[in-house]
Amino acid sequence: MRLGTTAFAIASATALGLGLTACGAGDPAANSDTTRIGVTVYDMSSFITAGKEGMDAYAKDNNIELIWNSANLDVSTQASQVDSMINQGVDAIIVVPVQADSLAPQVASAKAKGIPLVPVNAALDSKDIAGNVQPDDVAAGAQEMQMMADRLGGKGNIVILQGPLGQSGELDRSKGIEQVLAKYPDIKVLAKDTANWKRDEAVNKMKNWISGFGPQIDGVVAQNDDMGLGALQALKESGRTGVPIVGIDGIEDGLNAVKSGDFIGTSLQNGTVELAAGLAVANRLAKGEPVNKEPVYIMPAITKDNVDVAIEHVVTERQQFLDGLTELINKNLETGDIAYEGIPGQKQP
């Protein structure tokens, strides 16, 4: 997703509480109806940047003040950020965690003080969370691996670019990939390693694999689009074209890669929709309103057949999509399908 000046400022921040407030949210001291919600994310990836736009739009429409933090992939930084938000007395906390097995003391502290803490997009290993808004990453991993298996005709050599090791997205997407690989004994994994969701790290990782395996690499399975795009860059710089690549997330550059044929497909995890849904759940919990506390985001497969509509939502008609986001999110919470946005292949709830 496009990274503007604000996004770069967020990504570079390592201090606690960046204090970015949603436009129009208002001053909580002047308006007692304002809900103050703290947010800490693992990093400002393309996916999270798109998600921030969605959360800001939902916050503006619902009188929510957002206090944004980026942990820059550091567990201790994220723990300090959550501690700070608890001390500030926010009404709810949203966490996109660096690691699944982190933040146990902070989760317990938030619960003890009556502050709903909701992991969104990446899970926390805790029974004390107030809600849980997660994608089905196992299904997404299986979906992308099945795309690759179909393209390879059930045999060939692949490399796998993983997310940060130990993060729930990496663990579950790996599980889904392995489930499909078990059905195809003639597909061999030459190498797999993390590139931490980052495009630049994937470029370097892929160049090393190209040096080591050369033409043996028949396909690249990337656990997100950014890493797939890094692999694509490395392949092109090495003079290799036509190597099938599949990703997950459906960020702008990933969707364009599907349209151009550089990717065989992706799975749309529209951060704008998913993180806004997480905010809606946290907001209702903070207000004591009824809500499904554990909705699941099911990613639709994106191929050349339906990529144009996804591009409209993520890129070319984005403002129109953002303008209708609150209505979409609220309707999706009622139907239970928080991923629905009218992509061809999605079933109307």
Swiss-Prot record:
* UniProt subcellular location: Cell membrane
How does this protein lie in the membrane? Lipid-anchor
Pfam assignment, any one: Peripla_BP_4
Q: What induces it?
A: Highly up-regulated during growth on D-threitol relative to growth on glycerol.
- Which amino acids does the record list as binding D-threitol? 42, 121, 173, 224, 249, 269
Q: Null mutant: what phenotype?
A: Cells lacking this gene are defective for growth with D-threitol.
Q: Return the GO cellular component terms, semicolon-separated.
A: plasma membrane
Q: How far does the signal peptide extend, from start to end residue?
A: 1-22
Q: Which UniProt keywords apply?
A: Cell membrane, Lipoprotein, Membrane, Palmitate, Signal, Sugar transport, Transport
Extract the GO molecular function terms from the UniProt entry: carbohydrate binding
Concerning its family, UniProt says:
Belongs to the bacterial solute-binding protein 2 family.
Q: Any idea what job this protein has?
A: Part of an ABC transporter complex involved in D-threitol import. Binds D-threitol. Functions in the transport for the degradation pathway of D-threitol, that allows M.smegmatis to grow on this compound as the sole carbon source.
Q: What is this protein called?
A: D-threitol-binding protein
